[in-house]
Amino acid sequence: MRRIQKIMNDWTFIYHDGTKTVLNLPHTWNAIDGQDGGNDYWRGTCSYEKIFAMPEFDAETELVYLQFHGVNASAKVVLNGKEVCTHDGGYSTFRNDVTTILEAENHLVVYVDNSVNDRVYPQKADFTFYGGIYRDVELLTVSKAHFDLDHFGGPGIKVTPEVKGKNAHIRVETWTSVPEGEVKVTLLDAEGKTVAEGTGTNTVLNVKNVHLWDGVADPYLYTVKAELTVNGKAVDEVSASCGVRYFSFDANKGFYLNGRPYNLHGVSRHQDFKGIGNAITKEHHDKDMELIREIGANTIRLAHYQHDQYFYDLCDKYGMVVWAEIPYISEHLANGNENTISQMKELIVQNYNHPCIVTWGLSNEITISGRALKKQMLENHRVLQKMVKEMDPTRVTTLACYAMCIHWNKVAHISDIVAWNLYLGWYVPGFFLNDWWIRLWRILYPNRCLGFSEYGAEGMPNLHSGKPKRGDNTEEYQNKYHEFMLECFKRHPYMWGNYVWNMFDFAADARNQGGEPGMNHKGLVTFDRKLKKDCFYLYKAYWTEAPFVYLAGRRYEYRTEAVTEITVYSTCKEVSLYNNGKLVETKKGEHVFKFKLQMEAENHLEVKAGDCTDSAVIYKTDKPRPEYSAAKVDSSNWM
C-alpha cells in the first residue's frame, strides 16, 4: 500500500549570488523584498539542494515518486545528476517516477525560477509572485500496480454525484497503471459506515435518501474509497471526499443550491502572510478559515491561482462555495496559451472531487493592458471554454472583467456566467455608479448572470478622519464604502454572487500608499491576521445572527470635531450609546447605527445591545493628529 515520506527539513538554499543557507521548507526568497515596496523584489533562478537516504521499498514490486505541491513559478528537478522533470506553473501539484534514479544516498537539486518571461502565468498583476518551494515535498511509494499518478498531478479517482429526487447516483471513475487487477469501490457515510459498494474502473453507486452537502448550514461529506487488488491481494487504495449537491444559476434569481435560493456573499483570498509570504502552514490556512467563517461568508473566490489542497478540503468541510481559477491575468502573453491550458487542466484534474467548487475561472482582468493581441486573447478564451466544458460539464465557467471592460466586450460573453471587478466609489468617484452599472447590465443583458468578483477600498487602521474622502486610505472611508455596497447588493438580489476584495491585506510590491509601501490594504483584516478592521464587524453584522455589538472608530482616538459621529455595528435590533456613564440615545434599526455625540474633553463610550456591550475612549483635541493622514503618492493604483 502507498506510503508518504515528507522531505521538508535541512535543505540547502542557494541564492542567486551564491549565498548558501540551510533551512526547512516551506520557503520563499521574497518574504521580505516582495512586501516592502519599490516593485524591485528579486526575480530569477535560485536552487534548493537536499541529501536524503533511499526510502525503504521493494524494487521488484514498488515504485517511488517525487512529489511537489507548489514550486513558483517554474521548476527543473535534478536527482543524482539526472534531470527528472520540468514544470511551468507555480500553484499546482506535479510528480515523477524516480525509482530507477535512486541510490543509497541521493542528491536532489531543484532549480526554481520566478523570472520575467512571456510564457508562464502570472507575469503582470497586483500581487507579489513569490519564488520558492513553498508547499510540501514528498516521496510517494506505491505498488507497481497502482491508481494513476501520471495525469496532470491528479489523484487517479474521479467522483461525480448526480441527485435524483431524494436519491443519488455517484459515478466513480478510476485509472490504474496496469490492465490486470480488480477495483472495489466503497461509499462511507460521515460515521464511517458503508452505504454502497461497486466494482470496476467505472461504476455507479446508488444511494437512497441521500444526505446533501448543503453549504455552511450542513456541509455533509461522504467518503469514496477505491481499492485495487491483484491476484486477491490489496496493493493500492485512494479516497476522496464526496459532497452530494446540485446547483444552478439564474439571471433573475441568482444562485440556487439544492433547489433553493442561496445568496452567495463572500470574500476573495490571497494566500500570503506578513513576513512569511506564500510559505505558509496548515495553521495559517486554519486561521484564515476561522476568520472567514466568523464574518458569516458562505463563498470564497480563491484568487488568482490554485490554492493548497488543504484549503479546498477546509472549504468542503465548512460548506464554503468556491470559485477556483488559474492565474491567466492582466495581460495576454504572446507565448502563454499552452501554459493557460496546462494550468487549467491541472486545476480541474486535481480539484474535480471537491464539492465546494461550483465554477472554474478562465481569467482575471485580462483586458487591463489594452487591445494588444486581442484576437489571440479572445480565441484562447474560446479554447479554454470548450476544453473546460468537455472536462467538466457539471460546473459552470466564469471570468472576472476589468472595470473599464465595457458591458459588450466580447470576452465578457464567452464564459457561462460573468463577474466584474468594480471599484466605483474608490478608484472612480460616485457610489451611485454601482447601482447604475448593475441596472445598465440588466437592461442590456437581462438573461445573463452577473456578479461582482471584486469590490473594495483601502483602509489603514492607523489613518482616520471625521470627514473621510475617497483616496484618503482611512478606516472611516473604508467603512463608508462597504456600508454603501452592502445596501447596494440588497437592491439587486438577482446577482449570482459578490466577493469582497479582499478578506486580508496582501503583498503587492509595486504599490505605495497609505504610508506602507508594498501592500494592498483593502483587506477586512490586516496582513498579519492580528487586527480586525472596523468593516470586519460590519460584515459580521450583516452576515451573522448571533448577538454582538461593536463600537467602530475606536482607533480614531483623538478628534477635533465638536460633534462627532459614533458608528456601531450589531446584529441586535436596538442599541444604546452611553458617554461617561450617561445615556446619549437609544436607536432601533439593523446592522448599522449612527449617533451624534457632543464631545467632552474625555469620552468613555459604552454601547449596549441586549446582553452585549462594547466600549472605547476618545478625546477632544484642538489640532488634527498628523499621524492620522498619509502623504499622497502617484502609485496608489498599481495600474
Language-model-detected regions and their locations in the chain:
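Secreted/periplasmic carbohydrate-active enzymes, especially glycoside hydrolases
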Residues: 1-306, 312-314, 318-322, 343-346, ...
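Substrate-binding/catalytic cleft of secreted carbohydrate-active enzymes
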Residues: 171-173, 289-292, 299-542, 546-564, ...
